[in-house]
């Protein structure tokens, strides 16, 4: 089985970002993702366009764009432009916008769950139609269909994504906390079971929040379990946490593939060296 890893990061300066893009491609990462948090992150399509200029094969995507505060035509225009200048490497990652601080940053009150879900579906479907040629004459994307990545855990949206998305990104994030940015963790394997079932066979990618190459995986899982308020046994099973020697990490990847069919992962920048070494050693391959 081939497992793939994507890198989730954002720039701190130009030279570092361009270097990261080059190194991620050379190491065999499947995609370079960047977040969208209006008011507290860089502009996703600007930094992805910069990465496109210094790479040739790595996919480039938003992870994930807040669909609640953007018009479909502007989303379609940005992603079509990225696909054009990257030679067909764009991925459109969309979410419903569950973080209150993002809505506050644009001077709007976050709607309730039902309204956000309704609006997300409307925006996502309109954007896909435009990318297919309905209402967006120029630019035209290189790909016949720009892959749509849905990021979220809402039950209704997972059912929708099962029939409309090309990839479902599970982050393990739960309720938004009082600061408007941080979230509770929903890392329980039982929750993953339910979400994967809702995905209905659409490929799933897990966002790994904790990653460590170590000879003492038990100690790492014990520490992380406290952070996530789950048991050590659950920490050792959940796809959002990975610890161990290269062979132990490979065994966990295989275990997650057997249980959930998950073979794609996104990791944050601190995991770069460990994942790059894993890719170089050959137990996993870019797919």
Regions of interest found by a model, annotated:
Residues 1-287:
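Active-site-adjacent structural elements that line small-molecule/cofactor binding pockets in enzymes
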